[in-house]
Amino acid sequence: MTEDNNDIVDIVDNIDIVDYISIYQKAYSIVGDKTPLNTDCGVLCSKICCESEYTDGDRGMFLFPEEERMYDDLPYWVELKPTEIEYAPGKNIILAVCNGKCDRERRPLACRIFPLAGVINTDNKLRIIMDIRGKSMCPIVFAMQVDEIDVSFVKSVTKALKYLLPFREIKAFLQYTDELINEDQTINNMFM
């Protein structure tokens, strides 16, 4: 990142003046309509992500910081649930729970990039990894590695997340995501 970009971050990092709607619209457009496989991955899981009866009030996707602004007109198919999970001091994660019939054009970023996740680990670098939290529902998570997923999808996810990195709230969220996934991996390893 250039020094100029760092200056911009310092100027626009005030949550009250950052236009998160435009930011997320841009991130959504970067990912576009790309999917993890060159074919319809919903065939593998009976479209569990977007047309499923596999819904209940506790399963959903974490919204990125301030992404709830994309749902000010709360569509019928999604419910936003505040959690007690803090990704940063005083900053709680909001869970988007759908009724199993999502509008793909309005789905959250976490849904658009699934089964991948972006994390920032202790070396302060963005990494794109398989989101093992989804292994119970997604055969891709269970059976594949990131390098086996469609390259254009991985590149677009990487580009979208790099675009979001200058915003401190989002960077903190990606750092916390790394912690969550590491905890999940540790628990999984205990039972393997």
Where are these regions (language model features)?
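Short loop/turn segments that flank or connect secondary-structure elements
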Residues: 1-192
